């Protein structure tokens, strides 16, 4: 049956292809096309779209839970963004617009936010949406306490129901990133009745106010959502405001790359995520398939040097590494021009990104060698430097499997550092938590997704070391930086915030604490029948506006 | 004979219990903090970690944990996953059919392909057919399964569009994974059937049958093959374990549901209750298949039936 | 493209076979080819620098994913490394993994099986129940558990692979010992007053090793395959000079755009395992033509 359908589909697409070719004019294939479906193309095509249809979307990994407040994984967000709405909506430019909250005010001291809620919203299980429901969500987060939700709430101290449709959030300290957090899917609002009904199994039975209702989750196989017919509170960023055009969304979990991409090529699914760079060109040549790339925001994938371990506690030693690693070559070799190289800890799309860092660090082997000479590391017999009988070793920790070719970055860095007499010992393992807990690493790569530059707090503040629940991989402990991070979180003037975060970013490069490598573009391949696929500020897909051309 | 089966069932039960106890010990002895694994990148405070450890009873000494586990098992309580707190039993039961189907199809492919090639190879001993059959058989066991799987998938699903790529709905999704895994077993069976056939052919009763004027076809397929099937059957019993192991990789390549993937995930995240549960089921499958193999001997070879 | 590379060795075999039909029996030809492959790859493993044209770590960004050519016989990979060189150097760790895990698993299993078979009685009962229990645990479980818990290193991978093979060696060894134990020469030796140790060492063991050796030979190939499976599941060792399994599993994403990156390492594995199996088969025929299936049917 499936085969039959795909045959028909080939006939259809043959026709639509010709139209598309005419519309496109010149048929040049761009490898890097953040959003290939030009607006003109979209309107022309959507005229022929019909209601209904099932969107099949192949995911590379499985969500851990669909309880928004309990997950920390991007893949979970991709699924539950369709089930849950948030209080506010953050546009691509970073500004905030009303969504489930129709308006809000911030107190003078920045410690109280009062939200007026929409009065016409109900949860998918019929429970009315109101201030008590929102409060129940905060209670749930602080009771269950896993995932990203807590850190997004920052200095949250309590929530107060002012009246049926007004809620007040009280903070212990001013916390500027609050709205960005509330706009995130990780703080999507769940039905309080469902919390009670399902208890600790809520993560398998999510109920929100979003455009799609949860139907089923078959482990390692698929997650099925269906249209919420009563939906009429679409976010400001969407074209649609009423119920979705789709009847159903099925997320298929297909871990193996060849299988996942193959399933979109053969027409068995309509969308497949995480397209590897080497296949992008090939897929762009496929007349039935379009490739969309959306830059994710937060921190760029960077290598964090552990400043606690000798000899990498010495700034000169770290600078030698910084000068010897040729990031352009790495990014070009591995991503074939499909990923952008990063220059700073933050991604370019985030508030406070410091573009003055671009092109600041250039590879310079001679200088790197000189720095190591100055520190007394002498060239040994086997080409590896030595000092006091000790070899110059850099322990490179990375996770397995080879996500985004990060293991391959390690392999190239290993060869590049050999040129300056540094021996890189690779530790590529499933369990990175144990070596990190024990401090057995000199360099570790990481990237994070978040909408606010306050993300740096968790990476740099002296109290945010891993064993205390943070992600300060570099073990930075500098009172001045702590101070700046606190200022950044509480400052409400965007201009001043930018300056603060620029200082912090420069500090990280000047002190050679991190080596920024690439900015990750979330890449999906989809059938050209799928239209209206959008991505939010963080690169998460938005499926609400999607239609399927028959 | 019923008495024998009853004894076998009883010892089988002991074996199953023994195997889950052994796995408990192995998983306990191996390093790696289960609580740290559970965090999986979601860093929390040391206090929270300690609290989690207490909640799970992981702060208890080995013998206490072991007794607790064992008593629960005797009551048929498999516990709940530490990762997503789903009860283990329904979790596994949801995945067992898919794995059983895959294992069964692979076993069928193994026996079918293996026997055909083996017989051909024996009949045309040392000829070109023998050579080819053995080569094909050996090739099956010489390729990593993930590699065979990806190649089959690219060829038959993507280029030719004959089979669905991924998933576990319907018989069509079973074809390629079944072949991938079945080829491995086929390789062993070819050799086995060939060698036994050669032995059987040289036995006196075959000579007698021939001299009675039976056609070569009847001699070969009715009498010789029947005898040659016994080792192939035994082989199946041993191979169930291998096939179950193979499902881990094949289920991942073909994005199938199944206990193989559940097991791999659970081992890597040290999700003990799930590991225990899966082992319990694979042990039962293993034991049952071997029991069946023993019983089916008597149908293939009347001599065994009489001797019992 | 894939088809030609896979059928090529088969094609050559058939052709040569016709050419030498009168001189060489097909199975002998098979064996000859297998011997050559094993010999060549062993040389590669011992002294890769004699065979490989380039350095295995040479990363060349200007030469990425080049198809096979005169200067790069097997093409280049996504680092611009020469794939032929990788295959040659990869043989070292692959063969090491294969051999060492057979030694570890074989020694442990063999000793258990020998004790069980020779001593008999309660010891036999206990060991065999233990082995039976061990057999119900899928080999991959032990391998995964050990590899995941001990972390990636070649030694740990060897232990991981070996652990799952113990029962089969134990069973083979036990069943051979059982058959030999009551042979007349053993009884004769005992009647003239030889010590038990001497009987075991001089008479029982040497006459029981045939099926065990066959299984061990074939086990080299199987271990390499298990190792590549672990790489596929993300538990392999990633080193400066990768083994075949790692090259194959890391390169599999390039199959549709640059088939040569993983086809050649894949073929290397297949050819090597195939050859080892052919040789194992042959040893079986030579050593013990009558009991050629004993290795698998043996046991309680």
Task: For every predicted segment, state its role.
Chain A
Residues 23, 218, 222-223, 324-355, ...:
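Detector for C-terminal structural segments
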Residues 58-108, 139, 538:
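N-terminal lobe/hinge region of extracytoplasmic solute-binding protein
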Residues 90-91, 226-230, 298-320, 324, ...:
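A bilobed periplasmic-binding-protein/Venus flytrap-type ligand-binding module shared by bacterial periplasmic
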Residues 102-147, 162, 168, 311-313:
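Aromatic- and charge-enriched surface segment that lines or borders ligand/interaction sites
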Residues 151-194, 200-201, 211-218:
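Surface-exposed binding/hinge segments that line
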Residues 212, 306, 341-381, 400-406:
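Structural transition elements
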Residues 231-282, 410, 423:
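Ligand-site clamp/hinge motif
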Residues 378-450, 522:
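Ligand/substrate-recognition segments at binding pockets and active sites
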């Amino acid at each position: 049956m499936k085969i039959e359908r795909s045959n028909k589909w080939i006939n259809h697409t043959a026709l639509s292809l010709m139209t598309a070719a005419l519309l496109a004019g010149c048929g040049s294939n761009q490898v890097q096309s953040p959003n290939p479906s030009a607006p003109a193309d979209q309107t022309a095509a959507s005229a022929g779209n019909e209601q209904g249809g099932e969107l099949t979307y192949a995911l590379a990994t499985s969500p851990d839970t669909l309880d928004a407040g309990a997950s920390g994984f991007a893949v979970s967000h991709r699924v539950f963004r369709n089930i849950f709405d948030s209080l506010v909506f953050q546009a691509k430019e970073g500004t905030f617009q009303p969504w489930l909250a129709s308006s809000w005010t911030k107190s003078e001291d920045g410690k109280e936010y009062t939200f007026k809620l929409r009065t016409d919203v109900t949860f998918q299980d019929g429970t009315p949406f109101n201030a008590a429901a929102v409060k129940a969500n905060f209670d749930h987060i602080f009771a269950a306490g896993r995932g990203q939700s807590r850190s997004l709430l920052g200095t949250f101290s309590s929530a107060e129901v002012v009246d049926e449709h007004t809620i007040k959030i009280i903070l212990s300290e001013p916390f500027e990133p609050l709205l960005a957090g509330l706009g995130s899917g990780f703080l999507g609002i769940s039905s309080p009745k469902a919390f009670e009904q399902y208890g600790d199994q809520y993560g398998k039975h999510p109920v929100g106010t979003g455009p799609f209702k949860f139907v089923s989750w078959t482990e390692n196989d698929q997650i099925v959502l269906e249209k919420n017919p009563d939906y009429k509170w679409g976010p400001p960023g969407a074209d649609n405001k009423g119920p979705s055009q789709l009847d159903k969304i099925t997320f298929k979990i297909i871990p193996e790359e060849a299988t996942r991409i193959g399933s979109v090529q053969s027409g068995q699914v309509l969308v497949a995520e995480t397209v590897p760079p080497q296949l992008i060109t090939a897929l762009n040549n496929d007349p039935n398939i379009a490739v969309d790339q959306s830059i994710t925001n937060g921190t760029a994938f960077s290598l964090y040097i552990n400043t606690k371990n000798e000899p990498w506690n010495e700034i000169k030693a770290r600078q030698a590494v910084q000068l010897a690693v040729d990031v352009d070559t790495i990014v070009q070799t591995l991503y074939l021009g499909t990923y952008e190289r990063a220059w700073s800890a933050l991604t370019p799309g985030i508030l406070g990104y410091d573009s003055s860092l671009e092109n600041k660090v250039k590879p310079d082997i001679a200088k790197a060698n000189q720095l190591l000479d100055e520190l007394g590391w002498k060239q040994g017999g086997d080409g590896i430097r030595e000092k006091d009988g000790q070899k110059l070793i850099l322990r490179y920790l990375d996770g397995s499997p080879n996500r985004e070719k990060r293991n391959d970055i390690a392999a190239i860095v290993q060869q590049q550092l050999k040129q300056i007499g540094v021996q890189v010992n690779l530790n590529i393992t499933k369990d990175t938590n144990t070596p990190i807990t024990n401090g057995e690493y000199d360099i570790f790569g990481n990237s994070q997704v978040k909408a606010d530059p306050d993300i740096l707090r968790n990476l740099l503040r002296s109290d945010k070391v891993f064993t205390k629940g943070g992600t300060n991989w570099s073990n930075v402990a500098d009172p001045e930086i702590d101070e700046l991070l606190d200022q950044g979180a509480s400052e409400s003037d965007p201009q001043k915030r930018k300056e603060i975060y620029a200082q912090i970013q420069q500090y990280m490069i000047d002190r050679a604490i991190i080596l920024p490598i690439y900015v990750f573009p979330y890449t999906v391949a989809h059938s050209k029948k799928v239209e209206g696929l959008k991505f939010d500020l963080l690169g998460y897909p938005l499926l609400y506006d999607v239609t399927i051309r028959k | 004979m019923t008495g024998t089966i009853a004894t076998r069932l009883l010892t089988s039960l002991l074996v199953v219990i023994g195997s889950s106890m052994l796995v408990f010990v192995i998983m306990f002895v191996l390093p790696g903090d289960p609580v740290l694994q559970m965090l999986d990148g979601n860093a929390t405070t040391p206090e929270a970690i300690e609290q989690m450890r207490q909640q799970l009873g992981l702060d208890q000494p080995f013998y206490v944990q072991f007794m607790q586990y064992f008593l629960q098992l005797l009551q048929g309580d498999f516990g709940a996953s530490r990762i997503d707190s789903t009860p283990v039993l329904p979790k596994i039961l949801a995945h067992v059919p898919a794995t059983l189907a895959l294992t069964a199809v692979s076993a069928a492919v193994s026996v079918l392909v293996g026997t055909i090639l083996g017989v051909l190879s024996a009949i045309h001993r040392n000829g070109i057919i023998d050579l080819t059959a053995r080569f094909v058989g050996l090739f099956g066991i010489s390729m990593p399964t993930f590699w065979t799987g990806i190649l089959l998938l690219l060829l038959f699903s993507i280029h030719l569009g004959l089979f669905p790529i991924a998933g576990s709905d319907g018989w069509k999704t079973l074809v390629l994974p079944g072949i991938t895994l079945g080829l491995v077993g086929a390789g062993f069976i070819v050799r086995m059937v060939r060698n036994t056939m050669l032995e059987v052919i040289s036995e006196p009763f075959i000579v007698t049958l021939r001299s009675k004027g039976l056609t070569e076809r009847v001699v070969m397929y009715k009498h010789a093959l029947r005898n040659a099937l016994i080792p192939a059957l035994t082989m199946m019993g041993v191979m169930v374990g291998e096939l179950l192991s193979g499902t881990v990789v094949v289920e991942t390549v073909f994005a199938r549901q199944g206990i193989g993937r559940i097991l791999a995930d659970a081992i890597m995240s040290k999700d003990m209750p799930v590991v225990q549960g899966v082992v319990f089921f694979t042990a039962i499958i293993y034991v049952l298949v071997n029991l069946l193999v023993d019983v089916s001997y008597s149908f293939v070879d009347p001599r065994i039936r009489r001797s019992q | 493209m894939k088809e030609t590379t896979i059928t090529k060795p088969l094609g050559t075999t058939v052709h040569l076979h016709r050419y030498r039909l009168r001189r060489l029996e097909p199975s002998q030809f098979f064996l000859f080819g297998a011997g050559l492959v094993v010999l060549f790859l062993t040389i590669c493993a011992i002294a890769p620098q004699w065979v490989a044209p380039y350095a295995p770590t040479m990363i060349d960004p200007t030469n990425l994913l080049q198809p096979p050519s005169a200067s790069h016989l097997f093409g280049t990979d996504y680092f611009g490394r020469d794939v032929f060189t990788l295959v040659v150097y990869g043989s070292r760790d692959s063969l090491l993994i294969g051999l060492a895990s057979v030694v570890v698993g074989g020694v442990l299993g063999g000793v258990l099986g020998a004790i069980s078979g020779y001593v008999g009685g309660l010891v036999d009962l206990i060991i065999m129940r233990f082995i039976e229990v061990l057999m119900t645990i899928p080999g991959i479980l032990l391998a995964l558990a050990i590899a995941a818990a001990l972390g990636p290193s070649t030694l740990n991978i060897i232990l991981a692979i070996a652990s799952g093979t113990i029962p089969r060696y134990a069973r083979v060894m036990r069943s051979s010992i059982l058959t030999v134990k009551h042979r007349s020469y053993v009884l004769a030796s005992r009647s003239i007053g030889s010590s038990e140790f001497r009987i075991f060492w001089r008479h029982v063991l040497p006459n029981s090793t045939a099926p065990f050796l066959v299984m061990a030979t074939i086990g080299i190939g199987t271990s390499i395959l298990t190792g590549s499976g672990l790489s596929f599941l993300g538990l392999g060792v990633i080193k400066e000079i990768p083994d075949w399994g790692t090259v194959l599993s890391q390169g599999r994403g390039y199959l549709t755009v640059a088939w040569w990156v993983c086809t050649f390492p894949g073929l290397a594995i297949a050819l090597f395992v195939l050859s080892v199996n052919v040789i194992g088969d042959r040893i079986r025929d030579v050593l013990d033509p009558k009991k050629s299936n004993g290795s698998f049917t043996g046991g309680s």
